[in-house]
Every structure is written in C-alpha cells, then in structure tokens.
Amino acid sequence: MARRGMKFGIFLAPFHRLGENPTLAMARDLELIEWLDWLGYDEAWIGEHHSAGWEVIASPELAIAQAAERTRNIMLGSGVTSLPYHHPFLVAQRFVQLDHMTRGRVMLGCGPGALPSDAYMLGIEPVHLRRRMEESLDAIIRLLRCDERVTMSTDWFEMREAKLHLAPYSDPRFHIAVASTITPFGMVAAGRHGLGVLSIGAGLPGGPEAMASQWKIAEDTAAQHGATMNRKDWRIVVGMHIAEDDEKALRQVKAGERHETTSYFEETLGRVPGTSDDPVRDGVKALTTVVGSPETAIRVIERLSAASGGGFGGVLFRAHEWATREQTMKSYELFARYVMPYFQGAAAPLIESAAWVRENRRRVMSNNVEAVRRAFTDTGRSVPDEMKYRTVGAQDVEPAADD
C-alpha cells in the first residue's frame, strides 16, 4: 500500500529483564521486527548499548543486517548509533554498505550515547560526548556527499584526505536522524544539517508541552546554517500498549511497567522514583504514554500532534515487554488494524464508499431487485419467497407480483 500521512514504527532499545536468556531475547526482537513488517509498519530503529544489563544489543548494524534478510518492506535504522564511540569514517562506511545490502532500507540514527556507564568504560568524560557527536556528524555528512577528500583533526579522531570509495545506494544518501531528549542539543544538531529528529523526550514528563518550542529551536538553527527542517522527518517516541478496551490494556501492563521502571531506571540507573500511584494511567493523561483501546490511541496521538504546534511525521513506540508475549504481539496488530488506517488514509475511501452507497441505496439498488425478479420470471419460474427478501436492495422496494 502506498504510504500517505503519518508513519509508525518502533524504537527498539531493546529492554529485556534480568535473568532471561539473552540469546532468546534477541531472537524475540528479530521476530518482532518480522511481525511488524508483515503488519505494514514503516520503521524499526534498533539501539546500541554496552552496559547495565537490560539493553542487550551492542551493534545495531549487525541486527539490521539480519533483520533485512527476514523482512521485505520495513525501513531499518540505528536507534541510535553513539557517535562518540566510533571513528566517523567507519560509521559512514558501515552504513553505506548496509544501504547497498538492504537496497535502500537503512537509516542512520545519531546520538551522543545514552548510558553514562558506557562512556565510563570507554574512558570518555560525559562532558565531551556532545562535542564529539557534533564533530563526528559533521565528518559523516561531508563524507556522504562523496564530492571531496576530507581532512579533519580533533582530539579524538583524525582523517587525512578521506573519501568513501563506495557511494550510498540511496540518492543522494540514506535518511539520517538525530535523537533529541528534553535538552535543546539534539534539535540544534539536527538543525545544523537539516536532518530528521527522533524526539525521545516526548515520552518524558514535561516532554509534550516542550515539543513546539523544541522544534522551533531546530528551525531557527537550520535557518542560521542555510538548511531546512521538514516536519515529515520528525518522529515522536512514546510507550504504547493496545488492547480491546482501556482497562484491559492498563491491567496487562501494570506489573511489567512497574518492574522495568523500578529495577532498571530507578535501582540500576539511579533515576529519582516518581510520586504517582498509577504512573501508566497518569502517563496517558499527560500524553507521555499510549495505553488503552484503539480509540484512546487515536485521541492521544491527535493531542500530541496538536501539542507539537504543526504536526509531525511519525510515531515510534518504545518497544518493551510490559505485557506477555502474546498480548504484546496482539497490541501491535490492533494498532495496525484500527489506528494506522485512520492516520494514513487507508480506511477513508472505504468509509466514504460505504456512506455513499448507504445514502443512495434506494436509487442505486432498486433496479437490482427487478433484474433478479426477471431472471426467474423470464424463464417461466416463480421468484422464491426467500429471494424476494434477501436480494440486495429489497429493503427499499415493495415486493412485486410474479409476471
């Protein structure tokens, strides 16, 4: 189906609770991407982490390479590549190779690195991460143009007359997006080059209210650098779980969400515990979480779009295992069946067609009743009583006597 309107996908860190078999956890991640591809989701962004136990994928490139062989249409991105941890020439080379191997289905997500413990083990002071990311991103953008030999020298990498010997498969290059939280850094980095944005901060307290002002930072920065921002390349990342009704969805995720938040974010990463007695329900009200029925999901996404001050191009669901495997897979199916068509326009022509036939039924269908009647009477047979009432259009036509 040709894509119109909003795009949907997942932001797959991934999150897997401690004590589980990590081999099976990664297998489930790939299974999920296959399922999303079959359901018609647009994108899957896969994370890079190196410590703290829960987020087990160290190389999104390796996961993308395997997922590409098991899927047909879904776009596959790094969500995100921690640029300060890698030489920019090698990042550019790897993603150009993936661009060819996937025939244009790869995307590069960029960030400074999410876990301080990763940077600590690599001997990088957190205060240098954002500067390093900017330097790396500048180098990658120049390399991907393939129109010059790039010489750069920083305190952590050097390039001497560097030029990619393999140009991107995509024209002019694959899509690049920058992760943005509640600080202005990500929007500034994206604005400097006119890149896409992954607003992870939309799922944090205070995030939705700040979205419009954050986007303005990107637009203002782009104008200063002769670039242009496009809202179609802006994706909002939120938690999601869908069931047949709101209370069922809330029940299914309550224990799993509490375990993830308490065990990982509070006890392991040191985030200050929240004060809400029902954080998921309150998150739905605050637009930081989409948990409920398909109808609730539509309302929350529409409110998020309004809060953004002009709309955005897509919604990514922060993949989690708050519910059981079966409930989680069903959640993605329900969203694909009942929410995606609303925002992508797939259901509108069908609804309009049904409404037109309903409104014009007497005029359009009445001749069919006569045609069916004559199919019997013209051969000298009586019209069966059942046909007089079951024929399409019979509701609006008085039964006629047989000729």
Task: Give, region by region, the residue ranges found by the protein language model.
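Active-site mouth loops of central-metabolism enzymes
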Residues: 12-27, 81-89, 170-182, 243, ...
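Aromatic-lined glycan-binding groove of carbohydrate-active enzymes
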Residues: 185-191, 196, 211-219, 223, ...
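Glycine-rich, proline-tolerant flexible connector loops at the mouths of alpha/beta enzymes
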Residues: 43-67, 82, 114, 201-208, ...
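N-terminal beta1-alpha1-beta2 module of alpha/beta enzyme domains
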Residues: 1-76, 173-174, 354-356, 369, ...
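Internal, glycine-rich beta/alpha segment that forms the wall or movable "lid"
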Residues: 2-6, 87-195, 209-212, 216, ...
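A short, acidic, amphipathic alpha-helical segment used as a generic capping/interface helix at domain edges
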Residues: 292-308
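Conserved, mostly hydrophobic/aromatic
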Residues: 8, 36, 40, 48, ...
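Hydrophobic faces of well-ordered beta-strands that scaffold small-molecule active sites
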Residues: 8-12, 44-46, 76-78, 106-110, ...
